[in-house]
């Protein structure tokens, strides 16, 4: 997934020769995730979480190969097909968050979801290494280095099938029989009170959580897609851009475990609000910066803010949703989040083309104000309990 913000905008500009459509790659990925999110959620609610993860791995593998071939052939149409397939796979694999929510008791649900995000550190760490390897092999073999980076992705995907197979029983089954796996105190000490809430209260909590996730996801994708292109305009090397994206990803995932623990300890709401504020501050820093390290620091903060707001929102949604409907609930969150991730990069491209990166940063900061106001209205009595 980290190859998309690293290479996607550059590939589109190379294939089309127009920076105005630089966000198209990220938007295509988001569109495919929009189209699959809810349906994969229904699939996992009916057939278990592992079914969704297997589907996602297969689609990701095939999509990466198609993108690599499209780059070699110089075909934008084939590139779009590959991005659609790859994006669908990435979207399906997101059911891992539902699996984590299923496998942990309410008092540790934030921690469980955050551990999945921690696993993404592998991707953020391996991405610059993969790009660096592709650069060296590309020069040695006379192959386009960007295409080669995508063609190497299946080597990383194949071992994941064995990891998914090792999960027993299916996480959904664990959620339905939670008392078999955890002591009573762990189940009662915190967590969902969805049965006690009326439909209006449930709706308010879900809207606040989904709006926060949608905004911070769209803002993060927009900033990342455009800043990669801005760094390219500063004559930064592909390795420098990849390193910048890796630092952004470190912000997204490196602190997710303590953030998840914090959400379990002090509540989902304060963690979400803090994340939104940090994401807005990072966007402002990007808008004010002209150099490599200032922009990179800003995108790191955007990633860190995303971690708090997005993980907290996912945890809040699962708090008020029973196991038999969690896949669909997170599917709805994914649908709207990726709809924002689809449209905002295109808007970001137009802002950069019509104005500059400074205006993009200010716009990114303004986006978080609405979810901050809505989330402030949520009443969380204790972590995972709402009224």
Regions found by a protein language model. Name each.
Residues 36-48, 255-267, 352:
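Helix-to-loop junctions at the C-terminal end of transmembrane segments
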Residues 58-73, 278-290:
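C-terminal ends and interior cores of transmembrane alpha-helices
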Residues 84-118:
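Cytoplasmic helix-loop-helix junction between adjacent transmembrane helices
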Residues 76-91, 294-308:
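Hydrophobic core of transmembrane alpha-helices in multi-pass small-molecule transporters
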Residues 8, 91-104, 308-321:
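Intracellular juxtamembrane helix-capping segments at the cytosolic ends
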Residues 116-165:
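Helix-loop-helix hairpin linking two adjacent transmembrane segments in secondary transporters
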Residues 154-179, 374-379:
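C-terminal membrane-cytosol helix-exit motif in multi-pass small-molecule transporters
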Residues 1-31, 207-212, 220-231:
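Helix-loop boundary and gating motifs at the non-cytosolic
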């Amino acid at each position: 997934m980290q190859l998309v913000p690293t290479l996607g905008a550059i590939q589109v500009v190379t294939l089309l020769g127009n920076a105005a459509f630089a966000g198209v790659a990220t938007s295509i990925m988001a569109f495919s995730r929009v189209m699959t999110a809810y349906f994969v959620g229904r699939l996992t609610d009916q057939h278990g979480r592992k079914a969704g993860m297997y589907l996602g791995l297969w689609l990701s593998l095939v999509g990466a190969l198609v993108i690599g071939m499209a780059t070699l052939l110089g075909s934008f149409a084939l590139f779009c097909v590959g991005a659609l397939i790859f994006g669908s796979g990435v979207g399906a694999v997101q059911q891992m968050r539902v699996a984590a929510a299923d496998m942990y008791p309410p008092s540790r649900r934030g921690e469980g979801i955050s551990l999945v995000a921690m696993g993404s550190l592998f991707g953020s760490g391996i991405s610059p290494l993969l790009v660096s390897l592709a650069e060296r092999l590309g020069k040695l073999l006379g192959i386009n280095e960007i295409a080669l980076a995508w063609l190497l992705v299946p080597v990383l995907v194949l071992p994941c099938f064995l990891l998914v197979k090792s999960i027993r029983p299916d996480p959904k089954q664990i959620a339905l029989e939670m008392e078999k796996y955890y002591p009573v105190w762990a189940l009662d000490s915190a967590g969902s009170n969805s049965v006690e809430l009326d439909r209006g209260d449930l709706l308010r909590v879900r809207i606040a959580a989904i709006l926060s996730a949608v905004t911070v996801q769209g803002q993060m994708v927009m900033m990342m897609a455009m800043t990669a292109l801005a760094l390219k305009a500063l004559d930064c090397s592909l390795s420098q851009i990849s390193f910048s994206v890796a630092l952004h990803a470190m912000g997204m995932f490196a602190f997710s475990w303590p953030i998840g623990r914090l959400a379990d300890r002090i509540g989902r709401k304060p963690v979400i609000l803090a994340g939104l504020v940090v994401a807005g501050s990072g966007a402002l820093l990007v808008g004010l910066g002209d150099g490599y390290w200032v922009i990179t620091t800003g995108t790191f903060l955007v990633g860190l803010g995303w971690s708090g707001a997005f993980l907290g929102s996912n945890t809040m949604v699962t708090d008020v949703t029973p196991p038999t409907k969690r896949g669909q609930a997170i599917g709805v969150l994914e649908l709207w989040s990726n709809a924002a991730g689809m449209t905002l990069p295109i808007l970001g491209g137009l802002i950069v083309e019509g104005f500059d990166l400074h205006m993009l940063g200010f716009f990114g900061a303004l986006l978080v104000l609405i979810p901050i106001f809505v989330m402030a209205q949520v009443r969380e009595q204790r972590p995972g309990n709402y009224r």
